[in-house]
């Protein structure tokens, strides 16, 4: 991996009219909050009251995809939401023939493949996957994700420990190749699927 760069977490709060459901503080869109501030004395009792008042179910229909046009992200749980401080949960959707950015970082990640067929390239080695598989990105691995189908999308649910690593000041991350700014050839029509399809049960 190339010499890593330090990424300093931003401390800016969402501005007026911005909501967690409609926008995410990732990539080049906005300042990012990876870890909420911890400062001064606090009451564990008050913190428990606050946590218990948080929603136990987040409506996926209210959380929109961003990025694209080949790789889209929908961030379900982030530290800035106030629900969790140690992990990051998001959905990735790859258009037909699409690919993600190529980068590397200190934290590991697990990709549960929900739909489609594709492959990873980790440190120059290809690993194929299909729906039902789990792809593991290990620490300090330069990686990129690819949809192997030219006609169908693919999607994966991703769990990361990135916020915990940021909290421990293990901030090293390096982008090697940015997300494509143009659709994959032949997939100019594709938009991320906002709805969830049930692939496991027959319709009544």
Across the structure, where does each feature detected by a protein language model lie?
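A generic "binding-loop/recognition-motif" signal
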Residues: 106, 125, 141-142, 162
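Glycine- and acidic-residue-biased ligand/ion/polar-headgroup-sensing regions
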Residues: 96, 107-118, 123
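Conserved short histidine dyad/triad with adjacent acidic residue
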Residues: 73-77, 89-104
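Short acidic-glycine-tyrosine-enriched beta hairpin
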Residues: 124-140
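Short histidine-centered beta-strand/loop micro-motifs
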Residues: 78-79, 99-105, 128, 146-148
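A short, N-terminal "cap"/entry segment at the start of jelly-roll beta-barrel domains
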Residues: 2-85, 172-204
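A short hydrophobic beta-strand segment most commonly corresponding to one strand
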Residues: 86-89, 110-112, 136-137, 151-170
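Short beta-strand His + acidic residue motifs that chelate non-heme Fe in jelly-roll/DSBH
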Residues: 100-102, 120-121, 137, 143-150, ...
């Amino acid at each position: 991996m190339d010499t890593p760069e330090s990424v300093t977490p931003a401390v800016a709060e969402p501005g007026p009219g911005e909501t967690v459901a409609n926008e995410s503080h990732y990539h080049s869109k906005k300042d990012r909050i990876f870890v909420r501030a911890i400062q001064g004395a606090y009451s564990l009792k008050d913190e428990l009251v606050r946590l218990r008042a948080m929603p136990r179910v987040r409506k996926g229909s209210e959380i929109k995809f961003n990025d694209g046009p080949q790789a889209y992200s929908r961030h379900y749980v982030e530290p800035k939401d106030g629900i969790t401080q140690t992990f990051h949960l998001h959905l990735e959707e790859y258009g037909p023939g699409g690919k993600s950015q190529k980068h590397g970082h200190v934290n590991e990640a697990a990709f549960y493949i929900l739909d489609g067929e594709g492959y990873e390239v980790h440190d120059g080695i290809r690993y194929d996957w299909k729906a039902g598989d789990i792809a593991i990105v290990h620490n300090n691995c330069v990686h990129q994700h690819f949809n192997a189908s030219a006609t169908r999308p693919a999607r994966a649910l991703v769990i990361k420990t990135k916020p915990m690593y940021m909290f421990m000041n293990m901030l090293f991350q390096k982008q090697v190749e940015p997300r494509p700014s143009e659709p994959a050839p032949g997939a100019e029509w594709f938009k991320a699927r906002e709805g969830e399809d049930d692939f496991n049960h027959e319709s009544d």
